[in-house]
Amino acid sequence: MTYVHPVTGRTYPLSEARWCADDGHYLNLAPAPGLRRAQIDATERSVWRYAAALLVDRAHAVSLGEGWTPLVAGEWDGGPVLYKLEFTMPTGSFKDRGMTVMVSYLRSRGIARVLEDSSGNAGASLAAYAAAAGLACRILVPETASYPKIAQIAAGGADVVTIKGSRQDVAEAALAQSTEIFYASHNWQPFFVEGTKTLAYELWEQLGFTAPDNVVVPLGYGSNVLGADRGFEELHRNGEIERRPRIFGVQAAACAPYATAFDAGTDTLVPTRIAPTIAEGIATTRPTRVAEVLHVIRQSGGSIVAVDEAEIVDALGRLARRGLYVEPTSAVAAAGLTRLLASGNIATDETTVLVLTGSGLKASATIGDLLQLAPRQDDR
């Protein structure tokens, strides 16, 4: 197996940890063989139950018990939905699914110090897995990142540095520092997507070894989109599913570069208005794997929708009243599902999975303000 340059086709051996090609372009992993049903390790209750499909020797696994998150049947706008509770991961977000595989690979290749840029969740996840692996860790975060996320990162022993400006400014600062410390970016290092592909394997197993009709996810850089596609593609190639699901990405309208490009019919970013959004976890202006994410969604038969701030707040409150306390970024997907059902793009007789990616515990102060929550005074 090798790294593969998606444009030139040049390959690089996996024996050397890389986050980009020699020309600075991102790299993918060559197609993997995947697994068949009989190869699942049913004794393992983490993503490593699918170790036979992962391109990392299990002997090097750094695990905190991530994965195998609940799939809960519910209702949304009059139709059935399956809530995938990724926010129940060890550090409170889906990022653990990719981080366990990426950190395991990096440690197996002798990497001792790692750098990441993050709005919060990826940083918290890398800090935790780096601590578990015994790696030194530096995390760059935007100065607007919520304090609970910063505290979670720092508690793991990481060196946390705030950067002025946008989420993109933070990414560029990390690139500038990548010459002195290994850039373990979940948006660049393809072993992260090797981990997020286990979302597809879990859904397949939890649904009785079938694929859903639709998967709806918040869309920032696109690691859930790419991971789900990689996993379902492996299952389809191995004859374990008859068809692959449609994948729908949802963005905040205030910061929707993918949605704008999708609507324009291009495979590159086009000029779009950018404004602040409460969905800070997906507020990226220049994602890395643009053509790839757009291709995956189009090929699946899905689409990308953008929702406004009021829709996000409404979905946030509705989810909370169903017992699903998620951060605003997760609520973006639910707001998008409302639009997709109303437009008929998703039908109520289809099996639809709504992926809830991050815990509300990371943003309680913000959620309290958005939903105008306050205790009632007891005047007795």
Language model region names:
Residues M1-R380:
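PLP-dependent amino-acid enzyme catalytic core
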